[in-house]
Amino acid sequence: MEILLVNDDGIYSNGLLALKNVICEEFDANVTVVAPTNQQSGIGRAISLFEPLRITKTKLADCSEGYAVSGTPTDCVVLGVHQVLKKVPDYIISGINIGENLGTEITTSGTLGAAFEGAHHGAKSFACSLQVTTDHLKFKEGESPIEFMTAARIVKNVFKKFLDDEFPCDVVNINVPDNATENTPVEITKLAKRMYSMHVEERIDPRSRSYYWLDGYPVMDEEDGTDVYAVRNKRNVSVTPLTLDNTAKNIDEFKEKYGKKF
């Protein structure tokens, strides 16, 4: 079994290391780590088209070997498949992300971007994230004081359920609440409409020009059955099946209404 591990928090993230260690302990698999040199949160599925990329062999905190890529998480998947492994792995797992990836805002996530790129290449792909409620830790680069081993074991247990089965979707998105134990219930969910209520903060620089910081406030009031409600209200692990096909579900209605207008 060939597994490629990627993330968007950078190759020295404790979340990535915890996931690698748990996967290596549990499975007889060839596990390869290819991750960004620097923090890439919020980059989505961006790919580097206008600058060259470099791959650097490096040592992780446990002295195992990984490959640092001077680009995005999607670049890591592309180079991991075409240059490092030179083949499509059986599985691509992206994470563990520092902070949950919920709702339709997953399109901005580098963690999900890498997983979708993996699915695009034909690998069975997973994205995994741990809820973080302390804002200053969410975009921390490198080592973090957050405890990831429980989340890693939960991800491993979910991952095991899909082994040897016909893969039911393109990407499985796993989100673990910050207080989870290995006995925390797992719930199959759909995407909520939103994870954050967007906020723009305006500031003034020393030359009296405006500049802006983008952030948001966590949404809590999504409906039951969504990933946001499962993680933030019920404190369950959410498992959401995702597809690369972004075609609207009501395409037949769309054709009926607009098809004759063209």
UniProtKB/Swiss-Prot annotation:
Positions annotated to bind a divalent metal cation: D8, D9, S41, N97
Compartments reported by the entry: Cytoplasm
Keyword Iron-sulfur: no
Keywords, in A-Z order: Cytoplasm, Hydrolase, Metal-binding, Nucleotide-binding
An example molecular function term from Gene Ontology annotations: metal ion binding
Chief localization: cytoplasm
Cofactor(s) listed in the protein's UniProt record: a divalent metal cation
SUPFAM superfamilies the record matches: SurE-like
The protein's enzyme class: hydrolase
Reaction it catalyzes: a ribonucleoside 5'-phosphate + H2O = a ribonucleoside + phosphate
Cellular component GO terms, alphabetical: cytoplasm
Cofactor details (free text): Binds 1 divalent metal cation per subunit.
Signal peptide per UniProt: none
InterPro entries xrefs: SurE, SurE-like_Pase/nucleotidase, SurE-like_sf
Domain of life: Archaea
EC number assigned by the record: 3.1.3.5
Similarity comment text for this entry: Belongs to the SurE nucleotidase family.
NCBIfam families linked: PRK00346.2-1, surE
Function: Nucleotidase that shows phosphatase activity on nucleoside 5'-monophosphates.
Official protein name in the record: 5'-nucleotidase SurE
Naturally occurring in which organism (per UniProt): Methanococcus maripaludis (strain DSM 14266 / JCM 13030 / NBRC 101832 / S2 / LL)
Lineage, broadest ranks: Archaea, Methanobacteriati, Methanobacteriota, Methanomada group, Methanococci
